Regions:
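N-terminal metal-binding scaffold of metallo-dependent hydrolase/deaminase domains
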Residues: 1-56
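Residue-level marker for buried hydrophobic side chains located in beta-strands
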Residues: 6, 63, 75-77, 249, ...
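Active-site-adjacent C-terminal substructures of enzyme catalytic domains
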Residues: 248-249, 258-326
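Metal-coordinating catalytic core of metallo-dependent amide/deamination hydrolases
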Residues: 115-130, 136, 144-259
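Conserved beta-strand scaffold positions in the cores of enzyme catalytic domains, especially
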Residues: 6, 12, 61-66, 181
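Alpha-helical segments flanking ligand/cofactor-binding loops in enzyme cores
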Residues: 74, 136, 236, 240, ...
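Metal-associated gating/positioning segment near the N- to mid-region
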Residues: 62-129
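Divalent metal-coordination and catalytic microenvironments
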Residues: 10, 37, 42, 69, ...
């Protein structure tokens, strides 16, 4: 297909501005009934009302597509994904059906620990190939940008490997999706550091953050701030250190119990707090006041058989709410 493209006779639904919409603003959309999108040399150069697509032969070197009144949307942004990993967890499905909780599965070596073990056993090429396959499927569903997390290594070598794979895919000239990388070394406590969470946070701060920053392997730093994983104080210490080194901040927050993760996200000026199934009223208000995006992951709640996050209450409180897949 030509790099020059005209899509005309489209009903375009498009956002305006470059900042997040909050509260009632989220219900406002710009709709262009007889719209045109112009792409020149692979770059979108015009979105707006029709302006005569065949005038004076201007577009004779463009490929023309008549949308016939169908809806045209911007590409989806999936702002919370883990697409670089090894293995699968099909056996855990039966455990869930029998009523086992997320944390009990983790305690018996399943969940994150299971995927960490499988990921550590795979090399660069195998992990990259699998990740590329996931990106192709996402692209086919209209996704054009993803945030991708590490977090299935929990050691220096494998965490860096995951981030290098994301950089490799993002630098590929044939890529279908733009990737924003997040370092999630604090996804769980590795077996090596069992009972020594503070020491593991020290390791991440001293040995991981500087290397990742120096090599520009990630833009964001994330932490699983949750009872039985990393405490509020441990999360604060890691994120403050990351912020001082120039990382944007994200949190897995208040997924299992109300734990103060939303409040911490607001305190530190995080880009987003994610999950939030158990976020408190105070946490929601604090996020709204601080401009922290509430990223909701309904598929996770569905898989865990948990109530969905209180998205409507977050919007009514003035939060910007995003949806992602996990």
């Amino acid at each position: 297909m030509s790099e020059n493209l005209i899509i005309f006779n489209a009903r375009i639904v498009t956002p305006t501005g470059i900042s997040a919409r909050k509260g009632a603003e989220m219900g406002q959309l710009r709709i262009i009934e007889n719209g045109t999108v112009e792409v020149t040399k692979g770059i979108i150069t015009y979105v707006g009302e029709s302006r005569g697509e065949d005038r004076d032969g201007y577009y004779q070197h463009y490929w023309h597509y008549n949308a016939r009144g169908h809806c045209l949307l911007p590409g989806f942004v999936d702002s919370h994904t883990h697409f670089v990993f090894g293995g699968e967890r099909s056996e855990e499905f039966s455990w869930r059906l029998k009523g086992e909780s997320y944390m009990s599965i983790m305690e018996r070596g399943g969940g994150i620990a299971s995927t960490v073990k499988a990921t550590r056993q795979m090399n660069f090429l195998k992990l990259r190939s699998a990740a590329e396959g996931f990106l192709k499927k996402m692209s086919a569903m209209g996704v054009t940008t993803v945030e991708g997390k590490s977090g299935y290594g929990l050691d220096r070598e494998t965490e860096l490997l995951q981030l290098k794979i994301m950089r490799s895919l993002n630098n590929d000239e044939h890529k279908r999706i733009d990737i924003v990388s997040t370092f999630l070394g604090a996804h769980a406590l590795p077996e090596k550091y069992k009972g020594r969470g503070d020491e593991y946070i020290d390791f991440l701060i001293r040995e991981m953050l500087p290397v990742i920053r120096e090599n520009e392997l990630a833009e964001c730093c994330d932490v699983f701030c949750e009872q039985g994983v990393f405490s509020v104080e441990q999360s604060r210490r890691l994120l403050q250190a990351a912020k001082e080194q120039g990382f944007l901040l994200k949190l897995h927050a208040d997924e299992i119990v109300s734990f103060g993760g939303a409040e911490l996200a607001a305190e530190l000026g995080a880009l987003s707090a994610d999950h939030l199934l158990q976020a408190s009223d105070a946490g929601i208000r604090a996020m709204a006041d601080a401009g922290v995006v509430a990223t909701l992951l309904p598929l996770t709640a569905f898989a865990l058989k948990e109530p969905y996050a209180r998205g409507r209450e977050m919007i009514d409180a003035g939060c910007a709410v995003a949806l992602a897949t996990d």
